[in-house]
Curated annotation (Swiss-Prot):
Keywords: Cytoplasm, Glycosyltransferase, Purine salvage, Transferase. NCBIfam families: PRK09219.1, XPRTase. This is Xanthine phosphoribosyltransferase. It comes from Deinococcus geothermalis (strain DSM 11300 / CIP 105573 / AG-3a). The lineage of its organism: Bacteria, Thermotogati, Deinococcota, Deinococci, Deinococcales. PANTHER family: HYPOXANTHINE/GUANINE PHOSPHORIBOSYLTRANSFERASE, XANTHINE PHOSPHORIBOSYLTRANSFERASE. It is found in: Cytoplasm.
Length: 202
């Protein structure tokens, strides 16, 4: 997605510890037109798989996931990082390691909104080591829903998260791929990668 690639080159910053700062695009400030285009790209890729639900994690995944759900005209469910007292039992729970939070994060989804019969696409902001996506995949498996594919706005290709998630057996679509980032070269980014099937599932 060329508009996203250019925005990362213009606005992205490398922080200590190998962190990529793009909070002017997706994590703090949102650019509506860019976000809408993200959703349209994800929807175009995953529509042939006939999803009936989009799943993400709060907070940064919500904007691109909502844009995708709007384009697909399906509900969006986002995993909560704290279990509210209003969440009905049973709940599906998994744990993820958050680099930005500096530790483990528990994720919760109510069985009221995810279950057997749901055909799910997961949308998130980053694909790095793949831990968060694997946690969401675990929640989907616990619910009895079917995971159709994974979509991420930005992939850190050098962290090899895509390969680590290969055992899930689902297609992965990303919109921008960070090849490397360092003080000498800055952020080296290209259009994202996809391994979507050419024909609808089944």
């Amino acid at each position: 997605m060329q508009a996203l690639v250019e925005a990362i080159r213009e606005r992205g910053m490398i922080l200590p510890g190998g962190m990529l700062k793009v909070d002017g695009l997706i994590n703090h400030q949102l650019l509506p037109q860019l976000t809408r285009e993200m959703g349209e790209r994800f929807a175009a890729g995953f529509a042939p798989l006939n999803p009936n639900k989009v799943v993400t994690i709060e907070v940064s995944g919500i904007a691109p996931a909502l844009a995708t759900a709007l384009a697909l005209n399906v509900p969006l469910v986002y995993a909560r990082k704290k279990k509210p007292i209003t969440m009905q039992e049973p709940t599906f729970t998994a744990q993820s390691i958050s680099r930005t939070k500096g530790g483990a994060v528990d994720l919760f989804v109510s069985s009221e909104y995810l279950g057997s019969g749901d055909r799910v696409v997961v949308i998130d902001d980053f694909l790095a080591s793949g831990g968060t996506l694997r946690a969401l995949a675990g929640i989907i498996a616990l619910s009895g829903a079917e995971l159709l594919g994974l979509g991420c706005v930005i992939e850190k290709g050098f962290e090899e998260g895509r390969a680590k998630l290969a055992d899930l057996g689902v297609p992965i679509l990303t919109l921008a791929n960070i090849l490397r980032m360092n003080e000498q070269e800055g952020i080296v980014v290209e259009a994202g990668l996809q391994d979507l099937p050419k024909q609808p599932a089944g």
